[in-house]
Amino acid sequence: MHSQTIEMATRLWEYMAAGRGHAPCEAIVVCCSYDLRVADYACELFRRGIAPQLIITGNTGNWTKHLWSIPEAEVFRERAIAHGVDPAAIRLETEATNFGENISCVRRLVPELRRAVFLTKPNSVLRVQLTLPVQWPEMQGMVDAPAIRFPDEVSNVVGILGVIDEMVGDVDRILRYPQRGYQTAHNLPAEIIAAWEYLKSQRFTNHLVR
């Protein structure tokens, strides 16, 4: 792969993953995906006592509808139990198919929740940060992700090309979704827009908003 493509994609990855963190709270909300390392990180935080419960949310999405025959949340739950989490400390939400639904469905499940850390993939941190204020204004939410390096440690489920496609699509959503009421507005720096335009010119367009 061309070195400039990797450079531009790394720029997107690092920007989208910035600002993540966690603190003691009421629940760890796990936004499921194709990357089970998010489940592993949730188990690590749970063992450290960050929160007394895991709320795992996700049905299937673009990347997992052909990967597993059961909802993502059930796959992640099995992973958490295998890592020693007490099943009684896990709640499931199996309807959500995107970040907005992850948050709104968990809100319906536990409306009393006020402080939580939402876990996702590193390249999805910004998307979740921008979606939270729209879907759950009263939530004191933090967003965190496992420490995964691009490009060397990307998921082999989708590979480097798939992750670049995903990030290009995420930037597209950051630009378009505020007008649709899905996310809060966010001013992307010129260098991020330039990286996005370059990657689109290299035909990383499979995940753009349709």
Located regions from the model:
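A structural signal for short, hydrophobic/glycine-enriched beta-strand patches
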Residues: 1-167
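A conserved mid-domain beta-alpha-beta active-site/ligand-binding segment of alpha/beta enzyme cores
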Residues: 154-210
